[in-house]
Amino acid sequence: MAIPFNPPPESLPSQSSLEELLDFDWDTVESIADDEGWTWDDNRGAYFEGGNIVSPDRILSVTRTRMDGYQSQIRSVSNDLTSGNISVSEWERRVAEITVSVALIFFLLGMGSRSKITGDDTEDVKDRLRLQFDYLRNFSEEILNGDLTVGRLSSRAELYIFDAQNNYSLGQEATHSASEYPFYSNVLGSTMPCEQCPRETAKGIVPRGELISIGQRICLSRCYCSFWYYRTQNESQVQTLPLIGIKDGWIGVRVPLRAM
């Protein structure tokens, strides 16, 4: 039986102390697109590199590499806590800092460019982060109460960066207005998806609002799927996934990116 982790007792600082992490400037947020040499084309609603569209597979590959690094950071912070090198208060602050960083980086990636981010977009991002701060404070209190094992603590901490990464999808939704891009399709982001994600992909190009939101499926915040947006429903789907039912499971055949 796993033994609960019991840190030394302490009083947590006011949760409002995390509010200063939301005093950010988009001009200083790291741009994955700039790092990769991608340029956003507003007319096409997509990134381009060397004259070619940046495929969902390429974006996914870069995303996974980045997320591996952020997971390592979270694991290191949690290991510092369970090894007695930092307090719960210090752990909470560092997890919050990483979460904010990931959220901003991926929202910017989803938007395409800093110039497109409005004040309302910024407030939406801040509100989502404040909600994560609420969850994080409850998490910290559970740790201090000795309610969690080391393994459970570490795996649960990683969920914060996966939730933050979902800001990419939120940025994509914001930058593709429903009036200009009234249709979308699901792009599968995993070779071992939950049962819902392939089904959403197989629905094809559908009106906005007809697919289950990313982060609300069985795989929850660990979903790597994304949406691809279209001006008309008769465009070539960026990724198709024919499905053949086998008992309660599904087999999918993935088709490469098509020319747009």
Residues covered by each model-derived region:
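Domain-core detector
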Residues: 2-222, 228-260
